[in-house]
């Protein structure tokens, strides 16, 4: 499988043009997404459990935006206004019944599916999150920005067609990818999901679709259970266009780098997309309460650079990143800011984003070398994908 040839208009001209602006989509209304309170553990097991802030509190993206402001990153980005996704856009994936449920919950608050809390007035915020990623696509496909980062809440990659799931109400990146195809005529879209949890909703949407290549790097057997095995590679004409790379707990920079070099980059380049999209969750960081991986800000910089190189080589640099997970209250915002800093170029900043834990953060064994369990996982994923790709 090598993928169809690209439209000539989608490729970089190599003429040394001035880099296009980097876009940012952020709206203060995201901070009104009301996830309510959570519990430390299950009350059946921990009768002393106390309510705490929900892990997906929108305060985290607010902190990330504040950090980006303090370091002058947002000054070097073009602001892109978000808009609320309309029914016709949402119905490209979601069912009318799900839209009706979310609309009803707008008056009462509640759960939009399985663990997808929203408060009173939450429908507009959820539609705004989808529209923010769509607006990023608009800006990149129309040439107003070369790349764009949608810093949104609520996240989206777990949402299924008929229900929310895993803190996600609507599937932001799925709807935006369909928007890129329907409105901007992007024939082939690459979606890379590096969130620690598998993007089950995104896989579901495109499992039988050869026009969207979905690549997921995630912690093996975490959430949701039953999704993301290496053998899940697509169905029908879409077989070979789903690439699952489940990685063992504790995988760090070296393992992710190897996954990119052996699988992500060669397959992405052979697919040769018209648009690169990223479900840019940061919960694979070493300090996240909902994952057990070992990435640092440096890891997110490196993955961003590698995918930008794919976009530069295949589709004139067009890349859209959408915020997904990331729950470490103090560390996740640094990861978000590191991604944005990489897009604008750290050399343009008077004060680049520091690694909060200094050089020692990238000196652990998992940062320096690929462990045996990780090597086995990569070998298994590679064996599956060799059926479809010359890698």
Task: Locate the predicted segments by residue.
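N-terminal low-complexity, Ser/Thr- and acidic-residue-enriched intrinsically disordered segments
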Residues: 2-89
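A general "terminal functional-core" signal
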Residues: 2-25, 30-31, 100-391
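Short secondary-structure transition/capping motifs
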Residues: 53, 57, 79, 88-91, ...
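Charged, often glycine-rich, active-site loop that binds/positions anionic groups
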Residues: 82-107
């Amino acid at each position: 499988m090598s993928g169809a040839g690209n439209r000539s208009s989608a490729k970089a001209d190599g003429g040394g043009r001035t880099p296009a602006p980097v876009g940012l989509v952020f709206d203060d209304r995201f901070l009104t997404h009301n996830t309510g309170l959570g519990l430390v553990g299950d009350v059946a097991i921990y009768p002393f459990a106390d309510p705490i802030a929900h892990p997906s509190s929108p305060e985290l993206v607010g902190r990330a935006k504040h950090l980006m402001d303090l370091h002058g990153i947002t000054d070097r980005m073009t602001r892109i206004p978000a808009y609320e996704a309309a029914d016709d856009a949402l119905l490209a994936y979601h069912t009318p019944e799900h839209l009706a449920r979310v609309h009803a919950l707008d008056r009462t608050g509640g759960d939009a599916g399985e663990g997808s809390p929203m408060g009173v007035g939450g429908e507009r915020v959820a539609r705004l999150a989808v529209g923010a990623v769509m607006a990023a696509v608009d800006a990149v496909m129309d040439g107003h920005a070369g790349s764009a980062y949608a810093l949104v809440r609520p996240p989206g990659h777990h949402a299924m067609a008929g229900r929310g799931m895993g803190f996600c109400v609507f599937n932001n990146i799925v709807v935006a990818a369909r928007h890129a195809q329907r409105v901007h005529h992007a024939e082939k879209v690459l979606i890379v999901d590096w969130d620690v949890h598998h993007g089950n909703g995104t896989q579901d949407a495109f499992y039988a679709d050869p026009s969207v290549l979905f690549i997921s790097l995630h912690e093996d057997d975490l959430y949701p259970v039953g999704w993301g095995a290496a053998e899940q590679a697509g169905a029908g004409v879409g077989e070979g266009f789903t690439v699952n790379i489940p990685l063992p707990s504790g995988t760090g920079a070296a393992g992710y780098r190897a996954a990119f070099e052996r699988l992500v980059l060669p397959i992405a380049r052979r697919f040769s997309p018209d648009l690169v999209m990223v479900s840019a969750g940061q919960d694979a960081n070493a300090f996240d309460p909902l994952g057990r991986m070992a990435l640092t800000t440096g890891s997110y910089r490196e993955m961003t650079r590698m995918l930008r190189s794919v976009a530069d080589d295949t589709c004139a640099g067009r890349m859209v990143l959408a915020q997904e997970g990331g729950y470490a209250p103090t560390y996740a915002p640094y990861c978000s800011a590191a991604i944005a800093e990489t897009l604008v170029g750290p050399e343009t900043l008077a004060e680049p984003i520091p690694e909060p834990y200094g050089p020692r953060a990238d000196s652990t064994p998992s940062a320096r070398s690929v462990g045996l369990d990780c090597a086995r996982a990569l070998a298994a994923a590679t064996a599956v994908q060799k059926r479809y790709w010359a890698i």
